[in-house]
Amino acid sequence: MRTKIAVFATTVLAALAVGGPSLAHHGFAAYSSESVTVQATLIELRFVNPHVQLYFDVKNTDGELEHWQAELTAPNKLARGGWTQHTLKPGDQIQISGQVARNGGHSIRIREIVTATGESLSLREVLD
């Protein structure tokens, strides 16, 4: 009986130890609550697990190129929303709306992407 209790207690403690960091991984505290919109040129779309990665260039107010990145949701969620690895391609001109990193880094939590043709690739529909 003591062995069963010890195994149960160890399992619960392990779950609690791992649970906190995994929830923090999916938190958005690192991003500002203020929305911004940037004009960007897509450099690369990595349609990979566990999260799709988007790399793009943005011209700052001085006209200099800044290299930005964003992490989207899982590829299977985007696929259910109609996305494929070919939805966006390098060189595409896109408008990105979302919340930027609080630390001033060139990272953004994307809420919507608008293509040069005006097509809206909303992530709200995919995530809801």
Cite the ranges covered by each PLM segment.
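Bacterial N-terminal signal peptides that target proteins for export
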Residues: 1-9
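Short boundary/loop segments of OB/S1/cold-shock single-stranded nucleic-acid-binding domains
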Residues: 22-36
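Conserved hydrophobic positions within beta-strands
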Residues: 40-42
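Short aromatic-glycine-enriched beta-strand elements
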Residues: 48-59
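Short, structured beta-strand/loop micro-motifs enriched in basic residues and often containing a Trp
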Residues: 72-80
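Short nucleic-acid-contacting surface segments enriched for D/E, G, S/T with interspersed K/R
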Residues: 79-96
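OB-fold/S1-family single-stranded nucleic acid-binding modules
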Residues: 101-124
